[in-house]
């Protein structure tokens, strides 16, 4: 074990959707309603785009509201009840296989764990519980608390406040390059796992640590010199 005084990172904050949890349940629900297998990507990409656009104009809407709006455009043949079922599937996500080993590795080193989501804290807490991960996570933080979406600096700084730690002692881990870029711009240490995007977009600030999966990333973060 590395002593805290010798380690750069004292806490790791994880993105939630796609970083910790798979979207298979949402995809399966869409396909069950006759949607094409590509609909999930169209929906999720549009949802992020719409959320970022609202953020750029200083407007905030909770996850359920803009997700429903984005889904109505991406899959216009779905009725209200079907859209509701698709959105409910966000509460049935399963964890990626590398999540628990990564959490166990951090706990073995005494590194605190938090989750930072653009969704709701309640749903995230339920996902952690249903996947037997809740005991690892000290705090679940939602952008709802400050009504500003990642990747603006405010959510990452809010996480620092909740953890009562300076930016240089906290790492943000995600599978989205835009998320690690946002965290780095806010002063946090960053780790990016390539299992979703494959290649890190060159327009973004590079992460401090990168790896194929979460275990490799957290190992790299633990190894960072103070």
Task: List the predicted regions and their residue ranges.
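Hydrophobic side chains within well-formed alpha-helices
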Residues: 26, 39-40, 82, 133-136
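Asp-based, Mg2+/Mn2+-dependent phosphohydrolase catalytic module
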Residues: 2-9, 104-107, 116, 120-121, ...
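Active-site neighborhood of HAD-like aspartate-dependent phosphohydrolases
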Residues: 2-48, 75
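Alpha-helical elements of Rossmann-like donor-binding domains used by nucleotide-donor carbohydrate transfer enzymes
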Residues: 28-29, 42, 69-73, 85, ...
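Hydrophobic alpha-helical core bundles mediating ligand binding, dimerization, or RNAP-core interactions
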Residues: 30, 44-47, 67, 86-90, ...
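Short, acidic loop-to-helix structural element flanking the phosphoryl-transfer center
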Residues: 64-65, 83-115, 125, 153
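A metal-dependent, Asp-based hydrolase signature
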Residues: 37, 51-85
């Amino acid at each position: 074990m590395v002593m805290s005084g010798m380690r750069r990172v004292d806490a790791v904050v994880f993105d939630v959707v796609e970083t910790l949890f798979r979207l298979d349940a949402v995809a399966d629900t869409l396909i069950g309603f006759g949607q094409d297998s590509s609909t999930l990507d169209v929906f999720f990409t549009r949802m992020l785009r719409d959320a970022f656009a609202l953020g750029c104009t200083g407007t905030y809407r909770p996850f359920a509201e803009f997700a429903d709006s984005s889904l109505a455009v991406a899959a216009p043949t779905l009725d209200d009840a079907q859209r509701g079922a698709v959105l409910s599937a966000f509460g049935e996500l399963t964890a990626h296989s590398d999540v628990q080993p990564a959490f166990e590795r951090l706990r073995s080193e005494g590194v605190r764990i938090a989750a930072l989501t653009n969704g709701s804290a309640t749903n995230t807490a339920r996902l952690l519980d249903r996947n037997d991960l809740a005991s690892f996570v000290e705090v679940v933080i939602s952008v709802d608390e400050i009504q500003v979406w990642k990747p603006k600096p405010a959510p990452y700084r809010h996480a620092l406040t909740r953890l009562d730690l300076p930016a240089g002692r906290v790492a943000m881990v995600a599978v989205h390059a835009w998320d690690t870029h946002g965290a780095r711009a806010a002063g946090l240490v960053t780790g990016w796992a390539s299992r979703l995007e494959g290649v890190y977009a060159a327009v973004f600030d590079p992460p401090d640590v990168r790896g194929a999966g979460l275990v490799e990333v957290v190992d790299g973060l633990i190894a960072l010199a103070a």
